[in-house]
Amino acid sequence: MNVVIAFPSAFANTHGLAKAIKRAIPALTSVIIEDSCLVCESTDAVEHASRMTKLFGIDRVAIAKKVSSRFSDLCAEIAKVGTKIVMPGHSFYIRTIIQQSARHDYVSRDVEFAASGMLTARLAAIKAHPAKSEKDAQDFILVVVGQKWAYVCIQMSNAPGGIVAGSQGSVLASIHGPLSLLSCLNAAKGGFELVIMLPYFDEEDLKRNTALAQVFVTKTGTRKQKILATPINVREKGTIALFLREMIISEILNSHSNYNRIVLPLNIAVHPLWMIDLVIREAVSAKKTPFAPLLFMSEELISYAQVVGIQEQEILSETIQAKEDFFRKYSRIIEYEAKVAIKRTKRLDLEVGPNYLHDVIDSI
């Protein structure tokens, strides 16, 4: 029988993660906490492992074969699995993790030594051989020994890490460009459940921003989403328009009384310092707790964006070079447009499906 094993990230609460996995994948037969990992029995290990790689709070995900923890049986099963995953001419390494709660009359090194010997004999014809260390190995076999059963990992995948989604409560954020999308992804990785404000100038802007929101739900594996669709009006063009958009959106975030925490897509390399000071001061003045996940990123911001599929030029296009007197000149317009936008806001509660883009646009 194949199972899915989730290895929690360093700061994840194991019991909270178990609940999050059950909510995200209700089709799982069971979720068992085995000290340093969670073993999930599944009727479709491949599909459920794929979905688990999108969950925050998980560092790695493995599809594993559930086997007997008896020493002789375990070593034989490791060798059997190894013949299927070790490539001809490759070096391999077997690593065994025995959970603290497991009670067996052998230690990790016993399993690794015996199983390596058996596997070497079986793979002699294809000239595969054991490596001296995990670092030197071309193929790696991880074995987890639990309280009752052992698990031989067949396939390993990376997951996003971070803190269990929703464990830090909810936060209000806006998606209206690459920076705001990256801010939302970082906030989600920090354990927040996001209510998304989706501001837009016109139909084309709505399509662009909804496409970015779709990236968010895809990357985070979101199944249900709250959206505040908010039409905004900016008459100016160029740099002034960028500045006014950010200030109006910040004002709207500050004005929503149902949310005490907000995410601000501020970055020291993209926004002038006076603007960052102003936006944060106004948020605090409005009795909000502002979070700015990208604030001090520079070169690493570009690298992170590229991982998500955002190009460097898209980030640079959001650079604002407005002068401080712009705010004094446009402050009344910002306040007025924010009030109008809030009155025209439409709340959506969505079940995220394959037609997400059309579902959002049609609902608005």
Show where each model-derived region lies.
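Short, contiguous clusters of charged residues that form electrostatic/catalytic patches at enzyme active sites
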Residues: A76, F113, G117, L182, ...
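Accessory substrate-recognition/RNA-binding modules or partner subunits associated with SAM-dependent
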Residues: A10-E112
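Nucleotide-activated chemistry modules centered on ATP-dependent adenylation/adenylyltransferase
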Residues: M1-T53, R122-K132, D136-I364
